[in-house]
Amino acid sequence: MIITLALLIFLALLSLAASFVNGGLGYGYSSLSVPVAILVIANRIINPVYVLVEACMNTVMLGLAGKANIKATFRRVIPIVLPIVPGVIVGSYLLNLVAPLWVKFFVYAALLPLIFLQAAGFRKPIKKESAAGVPLGMGIGLLYSITTISGPPIALFWSNQGMAKNEFKAAVAQVRIAESYITCISYAILGLFTATTFQLFTITAVPVLLGIPLGMFIVSKIAAETFRRFAMAFNAGVVGFGLSQVFLNLFNMTAVFSYSFWALVIAIDLALLYRYMKDRSKTLEPKIVEVPVARSS
């Protein structure tokens, strides 16, 4: 693969933007970076790079989560973490076998409905959380090892369970550090780390040092849910475009169909964002209380 200066700048800026979102939400690095990156670079090349970056980043995020929040969520995380191992093993093996275009289709098709669910503010708590965690863990391990994406399903699960903000970040960090470490080991055994991996890693890792603290600072100034909704809105647009390109190149769909699909995704995306902002403005609207005025006789 020929690595150009333009590609390095592109990956550095992409990493900065994605780590900014990750710092604010506690997840989202891969969800934002991978759909954009695989438009210009194959999964087999970029996946190992992002796995290394996320192994480092998730370690930092776990440290920032705080011991009290980690302790409060540890038992709830275990049923998800343990099944990640077989999922990662299968996914890492499939990465060497599946054609890049099919991987792109799998990434975008799996990601888009999850993004829309988050953008819609979907909530329906699961009573048997531990039992639900087992298939979720296996699915996350499979998805992450093939695509390095797992933030949306993890975030959807924990937010659906009504976790408080700090406990939510701690739970997400624990799952993500487990999957990234296990995937690193699996990739190393399969020989997926190359000289190109480490060259691109140095370019993508440095912007994270700025992006994470910046995201944490910004989210402390605005509502975390508002930040999350705008991030998901952008993500839906990117994923919709990526899926339209897969329709063109993999399924030989017409340009009219492919770009009409992208337009539909954007329309749904904007409608969900508008609904959220409208509902939020109503809740923030000051209530006028009429105070009776005593009349002089």
Predicted regions and their residues:
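Interfacial loop-to-helix junctions that mark the boundaries of transmembrane helices
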Residues: 1-5, 41-45, 97-105, 196-202, ...
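Small-residue-rich hydrophobic segments that form or flank transmembrane alpha-helices
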Residues: 7-76, 137-139, 144, 151-212, ...
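Residues within membrane-spanning alpha-helices of integral membrane proteins
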Residues: 8, 51, 108-111, 115, ...
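Membrane helix-loop-helix hairpins that form the core translocation module of multi-pass transporters
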Residues: 44-119
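Transmembrane helix exit motif
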Residues: 58-68, 92, 106-131, 239-252, ...
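Interfacial helix-loop-helix linkers and transmembrane-helix boundary segments
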Residues: 65-79, 95-105, 126-129, 193-199, ...
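Hydrophobic alpha-helical transmembrane segments in multi-pass integral membrane proteins
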Residues: 90-91, 144-149, 183-186, 237-255
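Small-residue-rich transmembrane alpha-helices that serve as helix-helix interface/gating elements
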Residues: 205-207, 256-272
